[in-house]
Each structure stands twice: as C-alpha cells, then as structure tokens.
Amino acid sequence: MNKENKQELVAEMHDKLQRAQAVFLADFRGMNVGQATELRNELRKANAEYKVVKNTLLEIASKGTDKEGLNPYYAGPTAIALCYDDPVAAAKVLSRFNKENTNPFTLKAGVLTGKTINVADIQALADLPSREVLIAKMLGSMQAPASNFVRVLAAVPGGFVRALDAIRAQKEA
C-alpha cells in the first residue's frame, strides 16, 4: 500500500471513527475468512461495520476523536467494529458470534460515547435488552399510572350503576 492509499484510508477511518457511536476492538487470531465474512454480514444488519486495519493507521486516524482512549489497545492483530446506530445490538452480535463459533476472537476494549470500556463492560452492554424493549418498558411504566387512574374513574360510575341495578332488582322481587 503506497503512501497516498494510506492517507486516504486514514482520512476514511478518521471520518468513520467520528461518526461511530461506539467502537469495539478485537484480536482476531483464530478466525478464518468464512467466519470474518459471516461476522461482517451480521454486524451490517445491526448498522455496524467490521474492518481489519493496521494498528499504526488506526492510531493516526483516531487522533482528534473521542476514540483516542483506544490507542494502548492497538497491538497485535486488531479488528475494529464501528457501530453507527445501536451499540447494544452490535455488542450482542459480537458476543453471540463469539459464543457460537468457539471464541474465534478476543475482545480487547471499546469506546462508548467517548468513554473507554473494558471487556466486562462490553459483555454487560451485550446483556442489556434491545433498544426497542427498553423503550417499550419505559413507555409501559409511564402509561401505567394514567391507565390505572382511568380504571379508577371508570369504576366509580360502574359501581353506582351496579348499585342502582341491585335496587331495581330488589324492588321488582
């Protein structure tokens, strides 16, 4: 790769690092080409991207971004997963893929909203419910008091109607 191509790659990676909401690094030793392709496809479905880039180029590309905290982890064979949408979905894909394929890679570290996170944090992120589930739970908890209030208001006239019906039935008998 000549100097011009490297500069283009660094500029492209710098842009991608700035746009990414989360970034995960992995040591991909033990992963074959078929597994890498499968992982790329799965991450693409989660609006994430999987790339293998030289460590020195990643280090240069991360300068001036909130991903500079990853610089100590650019050692050995390094793959990078860039998440542009939901970091939880990408972390779930990485975790599930690693379990299903007998550990083809080892997670090193990541960055989430500018903060460097370790492997345990990435696993905790993967264990969270999906974004849709969290939103549904939040909306359900916000809606519960209002629906309970409506139910109480509806019960008062309903009780009154049942009492009148009981009095009517008693007078008819």
From Swiss-Prot:
One biological process term from GO is:
translation
Q: Name one GO cellular component term.
A: large ribosomal subunit
User: Which GO MF terms does the UniProt record name?
Assistant: large ribosomal subunit rRNA binding; structural constituent of ribosome
Q: Does the keyword RNA-binding apply?
A: yes
User: Which PROSITE patterns does the UniProt record give?
Assistant: RIBOSOMAL_L10 (PS01109)
Pfam families in UniProt: Ribosomal_L10
Keyword rRNA-binding listed? The answer is yes
Instruction: For this UniProt record, give its keywords in alphabetical order, as a comma-separated list.
Output: Ribonucleoprotein, Ribosomal protein, RNA-binding, rRNA-binding
Superkingdom is Bacteria
Disulfide links within the chain: none
- Entries under InterPro entries matching the protein: Ribosomal_uL10, Ribosomal_uL10-like_sf, Ribosomal_uL10_bac, Ribosomal_uL10_bac_type, Ribosomal_uL10_CS_bac
Q: Which PANTHER family match?
A: 39S RIBOSOMAL PROTEIN L10, MITOCHONDRIAL (PTHR11560)
Similarity-based family: Belongs to the universal ribosomal protein uL10 family.
State its role.
Forms part of the ribosomal stalk, playing a central role in the interaction of the ribosome with GTP-bound translation factors.
On assembly, the entry states: Part of the ribosomal stalk of the 50S ribosomal subunit. The N-terminus interacts with L11 and the large rRNA to form the base of the stalk. The C-terminus forms an elongated spine to which L12 dimers bind in a sequential fashion forming a multimeric L10(L12)X complex.
Q: What is this protein called?
A: Large ribosomal subunit protein uL10
Gene field? rplJ
